[in-house]
Amino acid sequence: MLRDKTITSSWYSDEKILKIEKENIFSKSWHLLGSIDQIPNKGDYLIKTINEQPIVVINDIVGGINVFYNVCQHRGCVLLEKDGNSKQIKCGYHGWVYELNGKLKAARGFDKEDLDFEELNLKSIEHYIWMNQIFIKLQSDCNNLPKTLKEIENIISPIKFDNYLFHFRKSYKIKCNWKVYMDNYLEGFHIPLVHPKLNRVIDYKSYSTEIFDNFSLQWCHINAESSPYKKTDDTSKAYYFTLFPNILFNIAPGRLQTNIIEPINASSCNVYFDYYFENEEDLESIQEDISFSEEVQNEDINICERIQIGL
C-alpha cells in the first residue's frame, strides 16, 4: 500500500510560494467576476482586482458586457474605485474620458491630431458568459472553460443558473491561506464534527466525490425533514463543484451560491459568497437559507483559522 504525503506546511505561509502561485496558477486560470444580474442597466459596472490587476466589467447595452483593465492609458491611474453606474469613464487624475465601450473620447490637454486615439483605448480582457456568469482570463493559455461548463451543465440538468436571480454578495476576510480554505471545502470528512446542523440536513452516508479533468464534484442527498430548502423532497441533492483553482458552485433546491476565494497574502484570503434564488419573493425562505449558510460558513472560518495557527 502506498503512503500519502502532505506538502510542507511552509507552503501555507510563505510569501515566496504565493508569488509562484500567482505567476503559475492565478495568472493562467479563468476567474469568475460575478453575474450579469449585478449590472443590469446601461452604465452599471463592477470593479475587481484579479491577481493584482485592477479590472472593470461594465454594461454598455449596445455592445453588451465589456471587460477592461481599470487603468487610464495616459499615466496608469486606476479609473473607477467602487461599484456603480456612469455614463462615461473619466480619469480623476488628468481628466481623460472613455466611452462605455472603452474608446477614448477626450484627452484633456491634447488635440485629436496630437494623439492616435485608437491606440489609447482601454485595454480589453477576454471574457466568457455562461448562464449569466461572467468569467475572464488574463492570459491565453488557460484550460477549455466552455467544455468544463458544458460538462457541469449536463450534470445538473434540468437546473439552469440563469433561472436564479442575484440576491446579494457577502464578503469574508479570513485569517488563513487560500489553500487552507480550499482544502477544507474539498473534503466532507469534517462535516459530522464541525457542522452538526449541516450533518442533519444532508445524508452523510451518500456523500460522494467525483473527479473530472478541470473540476471536481461533491454531492449528497438531502434529508427533506430537516432541510432549510423549501423545494426539498426525497430525490433532492446538494451539489458542490470546484473549478480549479478558486471557483465554487454550491447548488441546493431553489438556491445557488457561487464562491470566489482570493489570496490577500500568504496567511489570509477574501471569500465572496454570491447568493441567487429562484423565487425572490419568498423572503422568509431566503432568510432561513442565508442564516443557515452563514452558520456553516462561520464554522468553517473558525476551523480554517485554527488550522492556519497550527501550521
Question: Model-flagged regions — what are they?
Answer:
Residues 1-11, 162:
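Short, contiguous pre-domain boundary segments
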Residues 13-50:
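Non-catalytic accessory segments flanking enzyme active sites
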Residues 26-30, 77, 190:
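Generic structural signal for secondary-structure transition and capping sites
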Residues 58-59, 64, 70, 128-129, ...:
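C-terminal catalytic domain of Rieske-type non-heme iron oxygenases
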Residues 39-140, 146-154:
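Rieske [2Fe-2S] iron-sulfur-binding domain
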Residues 8-9, 21, 34-35, 116, ...:
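Short, solvent-exposed coil/turn linker segments
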Residues 28-40, 107-111, 240-245:
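Short Pro/Gly-enriched beta-strand edge/turn motifs at strand-loop
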